[in-house]
Every structure is written in C-alpha cells, then in structure tokens.
Amino acid sequence: MDSVMIPVDIAPDAVVDYLNALRGWQNMTGVLVTVPHKQRAAALVDELTPRARRLNAINVIRKLADGRLQGDMLDGVGFQLAAEAQGFQPAGKQALLSGCGGVGSAIAWGLCEAGIRQLALHDQNPTTRQRLHDLLAEAFPAVQLSALPDTLHGVDLLVNGSPAGMAGFDELPLPQALLDTLDSATHVADVVTAPVMTPLLTFAAARGCRVQTGPEMALAQMTLMGQF
C-alpha cells in the first residue's frame, strides 16, 4: 500500500482534539509523535504497549481495526540500534544521560536492559530526574544509579536526551567546566535532529570523540515504526 507522511505542527492545547480526529480518520494508519507531545499523547491514547506504559511516553501511534489508538515508545530501541551500528555495546559500561523526559527515559531503560553497569542521571527538573531514578531503581536494582558527577573521566557513553542544542534552547546540556573533562574515548550521542551537529556533538568531535547524531537514532527505528 502506498503511503505518505504529512508533517503536522500541533499546539499543546490541541492534542486532545487531534487524537480524537484520528479515531475517525479513515485513511490514516498511524502517527509519529515528537517533542513536546510524547508524554501527553501517552495519557490520551486508548492502549499502550507494556514498554510505553512503564515509560509513560510514546513516539508512535497506530490505529487498530476498531478505531482505537495504540501507542509504543521506540526511541530506546532506535538509540541502541544506532549505537550498535557504530560499534558501541553498553554491557558493563558507564554512562551519563542528560535529560530524563520521554526520550531520555526510553534510552535509559534500553541501556539498563542492555546491561549498563553505571548510569548517572541529570535533568534541569529535579522531579523529572527523581521519577526516572525511582523507575529504574525498582526495575533494575543491579544498575548503579547516580547524580551528575564532578568529572567525565571514565564515562564510556554521554547522551543528551534533552532539547539542548535546538533553536531556542540552551546550547549545551551540561556545564562547560564538566564537558572540559570529556575523554576522547567517550561515545557521545545526541537526540536532537536539527541541527544534525549540535553544539555538544561539535565540541565532542573536536576532542576526538566518536559521535552519534539524532537523525541516526531516528532512521534506525523507521523500519520498526512501519512494522508497528
């Protein structure tokens, strides 16, 4: 079946009406959800996959035969596939995640499932960080969870899961003084898709780090989205 993807810019207060319209949209089979609607949409669809229910966020919706909307969260899977394509394996490694919202939560969950040894969590909103910390602590008691460290020495993976680097947001997700301790061996990833080379990735590349862009994560999950 031939399909077309149509970009739709929805205001936050119009999400309810938009999803209600989708239920009666006869030639619509699914929707991709992006910032800032991933958590809001999760609360409004009719059904969630077990993964999306745990994370309370979605980035893809499909319409079931009876018209109900089902949501799933594939950002974590996409991130893992993109990282593996560059040769990064998280098992036994140490990671730092900045941004504990919808996409960050999905990435953190995926890293824990893949056997990450230690994971530092950072978010500008302490409540958001604590919510993810508690979720992971209960589900993955073997993973060492911590707050923002004093140095990035020894960190194998640094992930920006926040909007930092997008137009209108802070350029860097972490203090410059902390970033100045970044090792060249660290794998640095960003979820921001535009610009492709964010300020964080540009800085990391200049230090000799291997970098993973937002579009790489997005493209890695496209097949899974189509199959959902």
What are these regions (language model features)?
Residues 1-86:
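Phosphate/diphosphate ligand-binding glycine-rich loop within oxidoreductases
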Residues 33-40, 102-103, 163-166, 194, ...:
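Short glycine-rich anion-binding loops that position phosphate/pyrophosphate groups of nucleotides
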Residues 6, 119-120, 212:
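Conserved beta-strand positions in the Rossmann-like core of class I SAM-dependent methyltransferases
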Residues 81, 85, 193-194, 209-228:
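Active-site capping/gating segments
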